[in-house]
A protein has these predicted regions:
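Extended, loop-rich substrate-binding clefts of extracytoplasmic carbohydrate-active enzymes
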Residues: 82
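Acyl-donor-binding surface of acyltransferase catalytic domains
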Residues: 129
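A short, hydrophobic secondary-structure junction motif
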Residues: 53-62, 104, 108, 169-171
Length: 200
């Protein structure tokens, strides 16, 4: 039970869940995603609290945020799933069904304009950057998170900007279309591809 004051900003902690439950979408006023959505994936209220009565809230999970395809090398490629529009943040898992997720596919998140943040494991080997984040006008950050299993990751991030790493140095792979303000390019950057800033 939690007390919320009418007209104020609010948040509810996301529930603990197993992977089998799917990804937490948010808290709703009805079961199974029915009723009114109250929070985002982090449990932060979508707008100030507007009820003076007691309200029961229910967690909603989706198993269709992402779609996985098994590749010939026995690793998975990931792209958007049918429920992607329900999310404002997405975290790509390092594994799926016990196998490595190695690839962010072509057009993976094309035109997913509800998404503002994408978190990707440092174990990812291939990101089809020319199309994976195309037409994502509200995307402000692509973050690479540590899995603790990779010594020399293929990709890294800085303040939401995606870099590709090699022995010679870094290359800016993707600059989010929704990112604003000043940005200082990392000093060990050796390549800035043509049109990397064209959507900004």
């Amino acid at each position: 039970e939690k007390e919320v004051v009418f007209g104020t900003e609010f948040s509810f902690d996301p529930p603990a869940s197993d992977a089998k439950d799917g990804m937490f979408v948010g808290w709703y006023t009805g079961t199974n995603g029915t009723g009114v959505p109250l929070t985002d994936v982090d449990g932060v209220g979508l707008k100030p609290w507007n009820s003076v009565a007691d309200v029961y809230i229910y967690p909603y999970y989706s198993s269709n945020a992402l779609s996985f395809t098994l590749k010939a090398d026995d690793t998975y490629q990931v792209i958007k799933g049918l429920d992607i529009a329900k999310f404002n943040k997405i975290t790509v898992p390092a594994t799926y069904n016990g196998k490595k997720v190695s690839t962010i596919g072509a057009n993976a998140f094309n035109s997913c304009n509800t998404i503002t943040v994408i978190n990707i494991p440092d174990s990812i080997e291939i990101i089809e950057v020319s199309t994976a984040f195309r037409n994502m006008k509200n995307l402000i950050a692509v973050n690479i998170y540590e899995t603790g299993t990779i010594n020399a990751p293929r990709y890294s991030s800085d303040d939401g900007v995606l870099y590709a790493n090699d022995v010679a140095g870094k290359e800016i792979s993707y600059f989010p279309a929704g990112k604003s303000g000043e940005y200082a390019i990392l000093p060990d950057t050796i390549r800035i591809p043509a049109k990397v800033f064209y959507q900004v």
